Amino acid sequence: LLADIPASRLVIACDTIGGIGPRPDDSYPADPVWCAHLGARVPLLEVLCAGARPLVLVDTLCQDSASAQPMIAEFRRCALDAGIDPDAVTGSTEDNVATTQTGVGVTIIGVMHHEDLPKSLDGDVLVCVGAPISAPDDDVAPGRREIVDVTEVRALMASGKVHDCVPVGSHGVAWEAKQLASTAG
């Protein structure tokens, strides 16, 4: 895959899912399309929240190409939701050996101008949208209101009213708020 870089800064984020899915030796059973959705969602949110425009989605799937097709279709749909051309979705599957556990890796590559780096301003208010949810401790089922959608974050970032944004991961809201405060100057 070749891509022209129309800006001066690359923003790269990645995430993995392992042992969560429909395969025989998975520890936590889950729909493969939903696994793909969540696997793409985390790095897409990280790139969008950094103020970058996502350009490329790279997926690495530890399963054969035929069984991976529903996941690849979901990656293309997620890419489109984030403003990525579905033709800029690329990746690899494991067709050389049989696998019995789900393994997903997703990398998002985005671009931004140096001056576009989001920065909190004095007097800004911290607002939480959604809640940190993670398997196996939580029921990570489709349709939960606490799971913020990529299109919602895109709209927030494009509104001009959000100065800084960060997806809350497994560290929790307090840890992420401290990260925002430490970069606010």
Kindly give the residue locations of the regions a language model identified.
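Glycine-rich phosphate/pyrophosphate-binding loop regions near the starts of catalytic domains
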Residues: 1-72, 76-133
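Glycine- and other small-residue-rich loops at beta-strand/loop junctions that grip anionic moieties
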Residues: 60, 142-145, 166-169
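Glycine-/charge-enriched secondary-structure boundary and capping motifs
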Residues: 74-85, 99-100, 159-185
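Short, hydrophobic/aliphatic alpha-helical segments
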Residues: 33-36, 151-161
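Active-site glycine-rich loop that binds ribose-phosphate moieties when present
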Residues: 90, 107-117, 141-157
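Short, Lys/Arg- and Gly-enriched loop/turn segments at beta-strand edges
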Residues: 134-141
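Short, solvent-exposed amphipathic alpha-helical segments in soluble enzyme
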Residues: 122-123, 142-145, 177-184
